[in-house]
Amino acid sequence: MGYYAIFAVVLPFLWTCFYLLKLNPTSKLTSTIRLPPGPRPLPIIGNLHQLGERPHRTLANLAKVYGPIISLKFGSITTIAVSSADVAKEMFQKHDLALASRKVPAAVRANGHDNFSVAWLPVTPKWRFLRKISAIQLFSTQRLDARQSLRQAKVVELLDYIKARSNAGEPVDIGEAAFTTSLNLLSNTFFSMDLASYSSAASGEFKELVWKIMEEIGKPNLADCFPLVGFISRMSVNRELMGYGNKLNEVFAEIIEKRLSAANSSEGRGNGDVLDTLLRIMEEDDSELSLDDIMHLLMDFFTAGTDTTSSTLEWAMTELLHNPEKMAKAQAELEQVLGKDTVSIQESDIAKLLYLQATVKETLRMHPPTVFLLPRKADSDIDLYGHLVPKNAQVFVNLWAISYDPSTWENPDLFSPERFLDQDIDMKGQDFGFIPFGAGRRICPGLTLAYRMLNLMLGTLIHVFNWKLGDGLSREDLDMTDKFGITIQKAKPLRAIPILK
């Protein structure tokens, strides 16, 4: 049943609920300050009719009218949208704990993912435990440094694939190639095995599967807007989402089952990868880690860790092809620092490649991995930037709006890596005009790995090859349109022809 058909069925019931609801007693704070300004909501549906297909742009435009913090109604849900660096700074520095909980979409609740996911759990002892495992076993400097050779090997495989395409004069689907590299890097880190190859359709199928999950979670849903009507959840949450999640879980379950069987046989476990570590922790006496925790942890990292990296790399290559003078500057720096004959870029080289780093950062500014940070929920009434954020309101931080705010960025619509050379801008949650991976206690734990991989892959692609568009297309013909989900991908995949230097 489609979205509007469902709405027509439940509208009379919602109308009745609207008049039967009782207002909660007002707190002292609610009697002294008001909600942020915003467009007048309609009865029942609120401001849902105004969102459109690109809600990040809609909310950014509304911020130009009503200010950097606005209030809306998504059905019955009070929603606060933060659209400036100043408001984000106050939010994360002053109210991070009060806004640390998540507003969990119905799509995430569909298979109970919110009960196990480090991305969606509230800040509880369980969340801290899972976060600690992620920080120590995956993303600590020691662990990242120990796996440099693995990342290098995966980039070399990417290089070999593109060389073969170059020799054949065939174009490369940049996003799909980057996705395969990211997927195999993660699968080798966790499982000591590849999950896809550049020559098979498996990578594209896995990429489509991950995108479907991200798309379903990111799009509006009636169950999120009218939580009092519980049966809508079963009607309006796309049932296909359960199928997508189950397909991923089947892959993980088979790998785990084989690993557990090997541990009980004469072969032993002995891979020394992340899965071995997680299973060992699970088997300890009084362990807090369960098999369900491991399955959902894998779901988190294999969706977020593959899609965001590959999408960002695709946008970086798109921007460089669209701005050939920037491509030339990045290539000149690589040649100067590494030399013409050096093919393999090491992670230790990245610190010397300032323009390359600036290019990655500018891509993250213009095309943030998520246009909205995952939604927060107010655990109490708070005063944010002189306005009331009421208890249980959901709060969206519009990274896209912040990234294109002219009060923070000069000429924000221009792709200009130079802006990151002129000033020292940190992306670890301290410079609030540039928080592509979030800020505060819920900042993305994988940001350091993502940043290393983006520089390594992009540097390799443009140092070893020149690139051109196929079919006689010029840079003016490049399609820069995006499509909305939790991540923003190119609406039309980038296909470019590599030319070996």
Swiss-Prot record:
The entry's keywords: Alkaloid metabolism, Glycoprotein, Iron, Membrane, Metal-binding, Oxidoreductase, Transmembrane, Transmembrane helix
Biotechnology: An heterologous biosynthetic pathway of mescaline is reconstructed in Nicotiana benthamiana plants and yeast cells expressing Lophophora williamsii genes TyDC2, CYP76AD131, OMT1 and OMT11, thus providing a sustainable production of phenylethylamine-derivated natural products.
Domain of life, source organism: Eukaryota
Enzyme Commission number(s): 1.14.-.-
Expression sites by tissue: Highly expressed in aerial parts, in both skin and flesh tissues.
Organism: Lophophora williamsii (Peyote)
GN (gene name): CYP76AD131
Keyword Oxidoreductase: yes
Cofactors demanded by this protein: heme
Transmembrane stretches, start-end: 1-21
Protein name: Cytochrome P450 monooxygenase 76AD131
Predominant cellular place of this UniProt entry's protein: membrane
Lineage, highest ranks first: Eukaryota, Viridiplantae, Streptophyta, Embryophyta, Tracheophyta
